[in-house]
Swiss-Prot record:
Belongs to the RecX family. Keywords: Cytoplasm. Modulates RecA activity. InterPro entries: RecX_HTH_2nd, RecX_HTH_3rd, Regulatory_RecX, WH-like_DNA-bd_sf. Its main location: cytoplasm. It comes from the Bacteria. GO terms for biological process: regulation of DNA repair. GO terms for cellular component: cytoplasm. It is found in: Cytoplasm. This is Regulatory protein RecX. It comes from Escherichia coli O7:K1 (strain IAI39 / ExPEC). It holds the Pfam family RecX_HTH3. Gene3D superfamilies: Winged helix-like DNA-binding domain superfamily/Winged helix DNA-binding domain.
């Protein structure tokens, strides 16, 4: 840390750090708090910012006030991103919980997103196992296990074969 940087108030340094973190991608409030509290890697190793709890609260409040930090926007974008990568609703819920998002906010966003989880599960299965999907029991079990690992619900997985049989 240079001498001019060390003389800057902790609040200004935290605000600068928050802006840099949020410029890369959206974060949940809990993620941002964790990253702000982590030591900064400097030329001489990890360096702490000697900020008070009030400084952290002011930075978080400023980010909320100016629209840089919005948990509902983060949740919506996170759900869209993870579903595009082929993950199901159970896995997405778990990851959002780990990121400090409340269950209510997660459920609200899951209801508002317009994603056909059954179609997404079928796409993942055909991408991995090819078309047509196997009907042999042992192969079906492999596909079910794969989709459960990806976070799909059993009802969506079973619908793949119900719709396939029609």
């Amino acid at each position: 840390m240079t001498e001019s940087t060390s003389r800057r108030p902790a609040y200004a340094r935290l605000l600068d750090r928050a802006a840099r973190i949020l410029a890369v991608r959206d974060h949940s409030e809990q993620e941002l708090r964790r990253k702000l509290a982590a030591p900064i890697m400097g030329k001489n190793g990890p360096e702490e910012i000697d900020a008070t709890a009030e400084d952290y609260e002011r930075v978080i409040a400023w980010c909320h006030e100016h629209g840089y930090l919005d948990d509902s926007r983060f949740v919506a974008r996170f759900i869209a991103s993870r579903s595009r990568k082929g993950y199901g609703p159970a896995r997405i819920r778990q990851e959002l919980n780990q990121k400090g998002i409340s269950r209510e906010a997660t459920e609200k966003a899951m209801r508002e997103c317009d994603i056909d989880w059954c179609a997404l599960a079928r796409d993942q299965a055909t991408r991995k196992y090819g078309e047509p999907l196997p009907t042999v029991f042992s192969e079906k079990v492999k596909i079910q296990r794969f989709l459960l690992y990806r976070g799909y619900l059993m009802e969506d997985i079973q619908d793949i074969w119900r719709n396939f049989a029609d």
